[in-house]
Curated annotation (Swiss-Prot):
It comes from the Bacteria. Belongs to the ATPase C chain family. The record marks D61 as: Reversibly protonated during proton transport. Its main location: membrane. HAMAP family: ATP_synth_c_bact. This is ATP synthase subunit c. The chain crosses the membrane at residues 8-28, 55-75. SUPFAM superfamilies: F1F0 ATP synthase subunit C (SSF81333). InterPro entries: ATP_synth_csu_bac/chlpt (IPR005953), ATP_synth_F0_csu (IPR000454), ATP_synth_F0_csu_DDCD_BS (IPR020537), ATP_synth_F0_csu_sf (IPR038662), ATPase_proteolipid_c-like_dom (IPR002379), F/V-ATP_Csub_sf (IPR035921).
Length: 80
């Protein structure tokens, strides 16, 4: 019974990491596409758009880093 619990914890951590990676990839690709679209429409607003792009990209990329920390806690803290 203990092995099943450990396997489920490892499986949950793997699902967390996979979904975080997919979510970040989709979010950053959508953000990059909208950035290029906005830069093509308004070239004079490029510096403002670039600043906003990097701020929001950092926020989008922060969520998978939090999930990595949670998954590592599950693997090494709870399952150990």
């Amino acid at each position: 019974m203990e092995n099943i619990k450990m396997e489920m914890i490892y499986f949950a951590a793997a699902i967390m990491l996979g979904m975080a990676a997919v979510g970040a990839a989709i979010g950053i690709s959508l953000l990059g596409g909208k950035f290029l679209e906005g830069a093509a429409r308004q070239p004079d607003l490029m510096p403002i758009l670039r600043t906003n792009f990097f701020i929001v990209m950092g926020l989008v990329d922060a969520i998978p880093m939090i999930v990595v920390g949670m998954a590592l806690y599950l693997i090494f803290g709870v399952a150990a």
